[in-house]
């Protein structure tokens, strides 16, 4: 199996932007959100179960999942969030692990917004935290998702605190500043981490080979 770098951060931290920079360097990415989206695509068995449970109103006119509506429901009704997690998490975890095990590259970027909250750290060889201030999180997420600030604040409150998240970090990228003004610094940091991860992956591979030779 490839060396696994877990990438995480709070809502609005810019995880996708950073992951895209690694992808440009040829690093394969396993994205938990993308796995989740594909598992509940139009016509999927899991989406059918969600619609049966919550009612047809949880679907758009085109038959796709209305994510904004679902988000509002589960944040106002914890028991419904628990039901949804019990349905989705086993399928998501199974597919994520399948994709991770299939990678042949030296290392893979494992992008999981709730890596710490869902206690998935043990799947990773190293953890990269994308760090921003709570104020930046709120401003970015509200603008990006066109959601009410109150809902974004609820999501932030449901995630681990910035301080606790940072205690799990092996590496940190501060992404507080606007990428348009700060892109060169971020790209350089990503390149440095990329080289480090290649070295760490090689060390792990060599250790594994040496054990097998004994």
Swiss-Prot record:
Keywords: ATP-binding, Coenzyme A biosynthesis, Cytoplasm, Kinase, Nucleotide-binding, Transferase. This is Dephospho-CoA kinase. GO terms for biological process: coenzyme A biosynthetic process. Pathway: Cofactor biosynthesis; coenzyme A biosynthesis; CoA from (R)-pantothenate: step 5/5. Catalyzes the phosphorylation of the 3'-hydroxyl group of dephosphocoenzyme A to form coenzyme A. It is found in: Cytoplasm. ATP binds at residues 12-17. Its EC number is 2.7.1.24.
